[in-house]
Amino acid sequence: MKKITIVSSKKYIRSSQFKSLIETLDSKKIVYQYIDLDKTEEDFEINSDSIILGLGGDGTALRAMKLGWINKAPVLNIGSGRVGYLVNSLEDIDLTSLLSKTNQKHLKPRTPIIQNQETNSPAFNEIVIIKNSPTRLLDLEIHTYEQKVKLRADGIIISTSLGSTAYNYSAGGPIVQTSMNTLIITPISPFTKFPRSIVLDKESSIKIKVAKNQNYSIQFDGIESISRISNEDEYYEYLLSEDNLDVFYEKDIPKLDLFLNQILR
């Protein structure tokens, strides 16, 4: 039986779901430790022999996935009911069976986007380049397939298939089946003419040029952000990593019923 590292925040500690989870782990004599996401200054030892168990919503799931990526440990995300797109319902899974061994049929590879070959800041949903000034557009240039397109917009989203129902969709992008493993380029409030989105194959590389004198931020899954002021043209390359993160899923099907119920309210 592997050691469990529970990743959550204070508001979930008080939930009945957290209590039920702890009771299950205690009854099976499963060794576990707890990481409080509200206390990011603490150092925790996580190794590849652990299973990271994220308890919460999609934000918690993404943070758990980043921890899993950095520590090369598989991840199981659990949320309340069917609220989240990235989480399993505790009622729908056999937790003991999943955690007793690494059952290959329940492991699904998730491939993040990486920036400039930097693997410590993976993005499993999307990377966003967005303006910091409310009144000034960004001047961007997109390079892919040995072609380039200029774009003036509030920003740009580079999304995975997994993240296609997140910010990508809010900005008018398409929903893509997660198993397709694509890259999606979607502009944010474009001023110049630009397709609503461009869907690229998994082997594609995207280079973005941000013109000089731009005030902008780069956001990774909404949980990490870097602010920049460009004194000269700046270039960023985005591609899908050659490595994957193993994530436990009881049912690897898109939650279209959940998604459509949300947007048709």
Question: What are the residue ranges of the model-derived segments?
Answer:
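Catalytic core of DAGKc-family lipid kinases
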Residues: G81-G155
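ATP/nucleoside-binding phosphotransfer catalytic cores, i.e., glycine-rich phosphate-binding loops
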Residues: S121, I129, P134, Y145-K148, ...
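Short glycine-rich anion-binding loops that position phosphate/pyrophosphate groups of nucleotides
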Residues: G57-T60, G81, L162-T165
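A glycine- and small-aliphatic-rich helix-loop capping segment at beta-alpha/alpha-beta transitions
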Residues: W69-A73, E91-L95, G172-N181
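ATP/NTP phosphate-donor binding region
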Residues: M1-I51, L55, R63-I70, L90-H106, ...
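Short glycine-/acidic-enriched loop or helix-start segments at secondary-structure transitions
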Residues: S16, R63-M65, L86-N88, D139, ...
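Gly/Ser/Thr-rich active-site loops/lids in small-molecule metabolic enzymes
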Residues: K150-F194
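Gly/Ser-rich helix-loop-strand patches that form or flank binding pockets
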Residues: R63, L67-S80, Y85
